Amino acid sequence: MENEPNTAQTSLPGALSEASRGSDELLKMAYAKLKDSSLDAALSLLEQALDHDFDNDEIKHALKCVHWWIEHTRRIDDLRNPYEKGAFLISQFKQYFVFLGQLNNAYEQCQYAIRFFVYSKALYFFEGLLSNPANQHDPGLLLLVGRCFKGLGNFDEALKYLEEALRIKREDAELLAEVADVNALLSQTKTAKALFREAFFIDPQKIDLRFMESALILKLRDIVSELGYRNEELLEWIPVYGYLQGVFSVKRELKQVEAGRLKQSIFLI
């Protein structure tokens, strides 16, 4: 008698492939809903995707991230002022970065969708405020609007708002770093180097590297981090190693206090 074919074994790979295709499609749909600011719809699709493919680490990661944002944005409806709503959304990134640091991986597609969700929703709140001429000269609002456009990949529009904010609030390290970052993203490397140098010499502690996106500054951050520096100490050493590595190579005359600080730091290496 001939052996009957093992139908379980022959059908299993096809079934797994079909399930994987189904979960991949649901994951893409979830990311699309996330970009449309539909957190609940994204959550529902991710739960369906997990039913299709329970071992998919990216789906599990995305579920954790969406749950986090649902939990941490509940109180936004209690805020009445559009500026407060938008600023609150962006402020949550600092806690979110800590949360992400506790996870094994940070899947880029997921994080792109999260950033798109936050910045597009925040920008929705801010844009209504910009119709008021008085708000068009508020450097705090202009900074947040510029940061939103940068996060959404519209670098030219980001630069317009950030440069306007910098004209109002000169020698602000946070603003200078943002303008430098956008210039680097626009391949204006010489300008970016000069502005980053300026920002870090003015006040490195005001610069949040977690909001920086350009390879120019992130590579320098990684170099200093690999030397064992962390947190506030890392920020203080970035201008020193930026000078030594030639990243801050665009020349300008250092103020006396800046030159003294730089020499002292180099002697300590």
What label would you give each PLM region?
Residues 39-75, 167-175:
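Short, charge-rich amphipathic alpha-helical segments embedded
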Residues 54-61, 91, 171-178, 201-215:
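Boundary/linker segments of alpha-helical solenoid repeat arrays
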Residues 99, 103, 110-134, 138-142, ...:
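Eukaryotic alpha-helical solenoid repeat scaffolds
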Residues 35-41, 71-72, 86, 110-126, ...:
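Helix-turn-helix repeat elements of alpha-solenoid scaffolds
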Residues 24-25, 58, 140-142, 147, ...:
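Start-of-helix register in tetratricopeptide repeats
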Residues 32-33, 49, 66, 112, ...:
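Residue-level signature for tetratricopeptide repeat
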